[in-house]
Amino acid sequence: KEVLYFYWNTRRVCMIYNEDCITTLKRDIRYDYVLTSPPDYDELGIDPKTHAWEEFLDSWVSQLKPTNNLATICTTDRKGDGRIYPKHIKVIDAFERSGWFLKKTNIWVKSYKVNMFRMNYMNILTFARKPFKVKNPHMVDVILDEKSPIVNGFKYAMSPLVCKMMIENH
């Protein structure tokens, strides 16, 4: 797995673990902040019409223990079977069941083009437990970045601009 390093300034080194969040959580490490996207239904082999994804979320959220008590979850609702599966609502419910509260919402607009099969935006949900500290509580709510990179053949990967903004704010 790839581990990325970047420097905020000359006095502090920040490490970004660019890997499966479950892998990171299994290690005995301290981490300040979580920025991740839970796997989609199909990545887990889950039927979206069942409650299995919510059960996965409950078991996963309970493992998050960032030292700054902030976690940002990026998720896109899914279109299928002639309906929209509201994954962002399920994420909010799972965090609230685990004692977190929704602190901030952002929307990443991926494109203004019409797409009959995919949502053209992503919900970026920041959750908190007290005490917590946010560097910029007045960050913009809507971010437009149409330059999604292609990662391992998957062309709807996270925007580096959005990731940078979230990390720098928290």
Predicted regions mapped to residue ranges:
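Core catalytic lobe of class I
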Residues: K1-H170
